Amino acid sequence: NQNVKPLTSAQAAEITAQTMNSKCADCHKPGTHISELVNTLSGGLLARHIRDGQRSYNMEEPPTAVTLSKLEHVLQINSMPPTSYTMVHWGSTLTLREKNAMLQWIKDERLKIFGDMVGEEYALSPLAPIPDALPTDPAKVALGYKLFHDVRLSTDNTVSCASCHSLEKAGTDNLPTSTGVRSQKGGINAPTVFNAAFHAKQFWDGRAANLQEQAGGPPLNPVEMGYEHPDDWKKIAAKLDQDTAFAVEFKKVYPQGFTGETITNAIAEYEKTLITPNSPFDRYLKGDENAISENAKKGYKLFLKLGCQTCHTGPAMGGQSFEYADLKGDFFAGRAKTNDDNGLMNFSKKESD
């Protein structure tokens, strides 16, 4: 109906909140009461629905790029709420108005997450091209480059950031587990530093909120770079201060000199430049129809149809969520589990993670 006015962002958000609370909360909000009788009669289906629902989208947590893509996909294929739910909860099927409001709300929320990073033109889609560059301070980038390659950040002057994140090896060291000071082996492999700027969290267990927090981890790790306590940044600063020329150059940008805060800030600023724009697929997303083959275009349509974007979303096509490793098979067959295999739970301390 052409006379129907489009919803404002506020209206879409209000309708979405009402709809979720009335039609989605049973499975997507913690604390849902489970009737033991109904669960038994359903063969455990009720409990599984609630478990899987809260794994997919927890309504009490702020929406992320991944949860937005998941919501968008199930709305597009009309799979939520599932038939097994609507059959016993009359009136829970989404109306067209509710569905359209939720789709608009999803785009509005996605714009908040990626708008400044990739621009409004691309932020509304589940996938976005990697931007040509991120805003950075060139002077800080230059200092960060030097620190990224500086072995003096380690106790025995043998390990730098680049030791485990070699730019000649796709931002990694190509080893099952990385080698730290005194030839010690870490418990997990080094993730690539390329496009890490787009990740929602840093480290495999998400314990760092951003690049700067991540940069502060390895120097204070007894296995990786050898230091252990926050006060040890003073020892690192003392070593760097012995390099008079570098210290003078550094103070021109950071008047307070070498500290844990300034060192990690410079490294993070440099890491923002380690992005990979203008791949053929990036160019295709920007509108160049000739950038990829017809077969690749078919593959992208299949990618969207099957819901691959519900995990592989954003400009880096991933790095936005923590997924359950038990969904498709036993990833730990043939070896003993280690503490690192706990993933997010090591940081969150939640058994559900």
Predicted regions and their residues:
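Aromatic- and Gly/Pro-enriched helix-to-coil junctions and flexible linker segments
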Residues: 1-121, 138-139, 143, 211
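Post-cleavage N-terminal segment of exported redox proteins
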Residues: 1-11, 78, 91-142, 217, ...
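Residue-identity detector for threonine
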Residues: 8, 16-19, 32, 40, ...
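Sec/Tat-exported extracytoplasmic proteins
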Residues: 23-24, 28-31, 50, 54, ...
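Axial heme c-ligation environment in periplasmic c-type cytochrome domains
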Residues: 32-40, 56-68, 72-98, 130, ...
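Short glycine/threonine-rich turn/loop motifs
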Residues: 34-57, 119-217, 282-353
